[in-house]
């Protein structure tokens, strides 16, 4: 029994029981029970993690001893990453000298410098070349490895069975960098591709060095120089790198490959893809082309023979895994080339693609320079070592993602393209046992993968299905419906005044439509602010209905006074905020301004009217026309930076003239005038105070709050007008029209009022920005709409005052509730559309007042504002590829979303620190910054502006790319950057800058996610499919500054985080921007 108990307890994973086997039976029971009752938490202890803690492991970086090998396995930056992960790192003295990395660099990075024997005895050894005999020590490097240690290096196991035998004797675990599977998830640690990229670039540089002419064509005074013609055979990594380098140097580049996808890549780089007449796919496994048929090879040879007579430089990269390189160019072809031509054989190490190649040598054969070097990556040792180091550090992090322990599991059962595939393919020996080659993975794609159609291609196919007849019929039907509606309005018109008002409304809408389209996107925020101020003309309605003496004497007069007071807040506050924003766009180099001179036309307009009124002239309609034209001019003035301040001045003149004309029509007595003046003065003072104190970053919520005032003023005016006009309904032929307009204006005003308050609460942080998705909200909204529409029936049928005022009160409440339910269901990121829609609503509410009071000015201005908001809403929706109904009803997905399973994102991301980011910024000549709402939230515009100023002074080309919906209202980011002093001429819109990304060295993405998400173009099943985005991933390097890798508002993973040219700089945007600014300043001062 004791032996049985000993067996049980020693086999138990709980440390509590591991030492009980030697105890006597009774004592065992007593201690067991006591321990159980006093240390119960140990029974719930988590299982011990597998592997060895990083801090107990040492990574060794020996010096490469292969002849002419200048690379080193780890750069100082790589050492720093491993030390940060927890490893101890030792580097052989002088290991990085040939790569321009001194021992001091490694010490600063956290490594210790030791001798060759000590380094090779490390737990984990990383090398470039496979272990070989060390001539200095007189011993094979494999014999110096630690027993049961780990080696990471290029191994080529199929060609080196003797080396595997030596490593097996040391019970070594070997990861062969040359065996990393060429699958998407492994791109970051594909060392063969990294080295091939360098070889391809170096091949062009060497060819240019030995070629006797310019690559680019030139016309000089001495004569014309034709461009060099280059043929590149093989569209793999090396071939494409060669094509890119040669094209950038101005040569005419031609590319050949047996794979259609590779030819497409040649074409995308600007090279001319060459094909043979015979159609045969060359798609093979592992990223290589397959061997072709005899007929295809004969056609290929014919093409090559023809090209040899035309081109100046030949670069060939064709390899077949595990076999001798195919001879593609025989001696006769080479000798047919022009004297002075150059051939570069990147397959020389495997025998070469040219019959005349001498591996490892440079020589001239009958005037043709042959470059057959087999160590091209080593000839760019610094760059090659850096990339190889990145490959190794990423591989280690990927195979052992645990934060504390180093551990990876090698399994023979794995799926294609997974991390298990990468580990099993890379590990060629486990604890001394050779496990190469890896077994075949499961779920291998059969043949060439079918290329998924892009969103643009699907949209083009969809457009092609619409026949010209159907398209024309759709247009004709729309015009037919519109003209029929106009005829219906004419028939239903109760009098001539209504027809004239409809005419005014229609013409004003057309003028507003064309005027607003001319406004530059950078000025959309000032546009909304000035329309907010102009919408304060609801004060006209309030003034027209005010009465009494020093105080209102009836309910309707009180409502009117309140409407005038509220509207005055909008007028004064709106114009002041607009002026503040426009002042921020001023540049130090701009000429002086004399805006006070606009007092001259203002004084002439208002003073002239007062003089005419005193002389007995009734020119109020002309005043309304002039005021309306000034309001049109206000919107038109905002089309450019140069006329924006004139636009704001015209808006003030228009509103002042309209108010003056209204007072002239009313001719109030002294006491009533005092009441009007007091209400407007108080409201204006409050508006000026708010506008003066508001921070520009809080502009969206201010606009939303001002919208609510317009909506409330419209409701009050409509109800007051009903109360005042009710006694005349029995004798007024237009009574029904007045009632309909009053009801409609009350409904629109109620929705605008409550919806704006909810938008304000979300933007101000008083309410959660996340959408409030009430159960059955669509049915609820439909019920509220039906009740609101149904309320007009008793309102129109029953002539009693009680029924009428009850219906107006009910629709006010119903519309207010509907405004809450609609806006609450919309998330914070959709606020740009919400604000523009509310802006449009306020315009239509103003139009309703114009019809109600038969006032041309209100109708004109309302149509301008309504069309302005509608156009901005349309622009925002187009920028998200969503319908307005989708946004307003709290929906998700774009109009292009296919609805299938979204694309799976694979791969690993690359994280960098501030020093790495500074190095990338320092090396870049052209930089684009793409800010998002994260910049607004963090208020990081000031350090970014200072950073841009310093970089510009260093001669770098720095610009901003702004997405239309990057912020919480249109143009918000433009205003924030202007506030920080960024010149507006370097702040470009998405459509203006998207075509520049491919030529940009570096993009800084600050606090943006969905607006730079490549899934919008790459994944037809994404919910943001078809959404126009900033194409930052097309640039050479991208740094994404975010708090985490989390999703954006659309809850869609962003593939750019995992692209090979993207680096993640994680952290708080404000702190990161401050740190970047400080680091650049420090570097700048040096």
From Swiss-Prot:
<keyword id="KW-0999">Mitochondrion inner membrane</keyword>
<keyword id="KW-1278">Translocase</keyword>
<dbReference type="Pfam" id="PF12769">
    <property type="entry name" value="PNTB_4TM"/>
</dbReference>
<feature type="modified residue" description="N6-acetyllysine">
    <location>
        <position position="397"/>
    </location>
</feature>
<keyword id="KW-0496">Mitochondrion</keyword>
<dbReference type="Pfam" id="PF01262">
    <property type="entry name" value="AlaDh_PNT_C"/>
</dbReference>
<feature type="binding site">
    <location>
        <position position="287"/>
    </location>
    <ligand>
        <name>NAD(+)</name>
    </ligand>
</feature>
<keyword id="KW-0472">Membrane</keyword>
<keyword id="KW-0812">Transmembrane</keyword>
<feature type="binding site">
    <location>
        <position position="933"/>
    </location>
    <ligand>
        <name>NADP(+)</name>
    </ligand>
</feature>
<dbReference type="GO" id="GO:0005743">
    <property type="term" value="C:mitochondrial inner membrane"/>
</dbReference>
<dbReference type="GO" id="GO:0016020">
    <property type="term" value="C:membrane"/>
</dbReference>
<feature type="transmembrane region" description="Helical">
    <location>
        <begin position="801"/>
        <end position="819"/>
    </location>
</feature>
<keyword id="KW-0225">Disease variant</keyword>
<comment type="function">
    <text>The transhydrogenation between NADH and NADP is coupled to respiration and ATP hydrolysis and functions as a proton pump across the membrane. May play a role in reactive oxygen species (ROS) detoxification in the adrenal gland.</text>
</comment>
<dbReference type="GO" id="GO:0003957">
    <property type="term" value="F:NAD(P)+ transhydrogenase (Si-specific) activity"/>
</dbReference>
<dbReference type="GO" id="GO:0033273">
    <property type="term" value="P:response to vitamin"/>
</dbReference>
<dbReference type="GO" id="GO:0098803">
    <property type="term" value="C:respiratory chain complex"/>
</dbReference>
<dbReference type="InterPro" id="IPR007886">
    <property type="entry name" value="AlaDH/PNT_N"/>
</dbReference>
<dbReference type="GO" id="GO:0050661">
    <property type="term" value="F:NADP binding"/>
</dbReference>
<feature type="binding site">
    <location>
        <begin position="1068"/>
        <end position="1069"/>
    </location>
    <ligand>
        <name>NADP(+)</name>
    </ligand>
</feature>
<comment type="similarity">
    <text>In the C-terminal section; belongs to the PNT beta subunit family.</text>
</comment>
<dbReference type="GO" id="GO:0005739">
    <property type="term" value="C:mitochondrion"/>
</dbReference>
<dbReference type="GO" id="GO:0006099">
    <property type="term" value="P:tricarboxylic acid cycle"/>
</dbReference>
<dbReference type="Pfam" id="PF05222">
    <property type="entry name" value="AlaDh_PNT_N"/>
</dbReference>
<dbReference type="InterPro" id="IPR034300">
    <property type="entry name" value="PNTB-like"/>
</dbReference>
<dbReference type="GO" id="GO:0045454">
    <property type="term" value="P:cell redox homeostasis"/>
</dbReference>
<feature type="transmembrane region" description="Helical">
    <location>
        <begin position="740"/>
        <end position="760"/>
    </location>
</feature>
<dbReference type="InterPro" id="IPR008143">
    <property type="entry name" value="Ala_DH/PNT_CS2"/>
</dbReference>
<dbReference type="GO" id="GO:0008750">
    <property type="term" value="F:proton-translocating NAD(P)+ transhydrogenase activity"/>
</dbReference>
<dbReference type="InterPro" id="IPR036291">
    <property type="entry name" value="NAD(P)-bd_dom_sf"/>
</dbReference>
<keyword id="KW-1133">Transmembrane helix</keyword>
<feature type="binding site">
    <location>
        <begin position="1026"/>
        <end position="1027"/>
    </location>
    <ligand>
        <name>NADP(+)</name>
    </ligand>
</feature>
<feature type="transmembrane region" description="Helical">
    <location>
        <begin position="596"/>
        <end position="616"/>
    </location>
</feature>
<dbReference type="Pfam" id="PF02233">
    <property type="entry name" value="PNTB"/>
</dbReference>
<feature type="transmembrane region" description="Helical">
    <location>
        <begin position="702"/>
        <end position="722"/>
    </location>
</feature>
<dbReference type="GO" id="GO:0010918">
    <property type="term" value="P:positive regulation of mitochondrial membrane potential"/>
</dbReference>
<feature type="binding site">
    <location>
        <position position="319"/>
    </location>
    <ligand>
        <name>NAD(+)</name>
    </ligand>
</feature>
<feature type="transmembrane region" description="Helical">
    <location>
        <begin position="778"/>
        <end position="797"/>
    </location>
</feature>
<keyword id="KW-0547">Nucleotide-binding</keyword>
<feature type="transmembrane region" description="Helical">
    <location>
        <begin position="622"/>
        <end position="642"/>
    </location>
</feature>
<comment type="subunit">
    <text>Homodimer.</text>
</comment>
